[in-house]
Amino acid sequence: MRKQANSHLDYPRAPCKTGSIRMRIAVIGTSGVGKSTLARRLAASTQAAYIELDAINWQAEWKPLATDDPAEFYRRVQAAVDGPSWVCDGNYPGVRDIVLARATHVVWLDYARPVIMWRVIRRSFWRAITKAELWPGTGNTEAFSAWLDKGHPIRWAWDTFAQRRAQYAHLLEAPILAAAQKYRVTHPRDLAAVESALAQQHNGASA
């Protein structure tokens, strides 16, 4: 598998099968809901590039490209979504339109707040314990000392939950997604069926 340093693109091991459908899937949802985990699985099952907007944004020492150089952030995202087949996850209003304009499918992970909070706390705890580098080449890790920061994923997920839910409900009705297939997943137990349906579409099979 070919990768780039601080890679926001993960390329498939092999070209798509003859007869398979080229898909561009946008995975949306609030912080900590599990977008990246799902997006990686979908990229593998549909043989598509994986685009992680957080990996494009966060530079070394937690410097945000989307804030420091919005034009460059936009350019990099545009270059990524110009590809023929991808799965993209992330919440960045400044590039939302260029992602959604190319999306053939949208998956909204709309779980209940307790589910999301459990997931984001568990994830942050594990990251802080292991000191795992979040994106290769950045040196960025999570620390317990940052848990009370306003921008930390735990606080961010809690503070923005209601606002994000309303935004996404409105977004799915937007004209830019009129031709896209949309999936709203309200419980983790329903996710397998959505993944199966998308994999079948990729393979050109009937659901």
Residue map of PLM features:
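The conserved Walker
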Residues: 31
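NTP-dependent small-molecule kinase module
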Residues: 20, 45, 155-207
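Conserved nucleotide-sensing/catalytic segment adjacent to the nucleotide-binding pocket
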Residues: 53-55, 60-106
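Post-Walker A helix-loop "phosphate-sensing" segment adjacent to the P-loop in P-loop NTPases
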Residues: 44-53
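A glycine- and Lys/Arg-enriched "phosphate-lid" helix/loop adjacent to the NTP-binding pocket
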Residues: 111-164
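Hydrophobic positions on the alpha1 helix immediately C-terminal to the Walker A/P-loop
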Residues: 38
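Hydrophobic anchor at the beta1->P-loop junction of P-loop NTPases
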Residues: 27
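Conserved lysine of the Walker
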Residues: 35
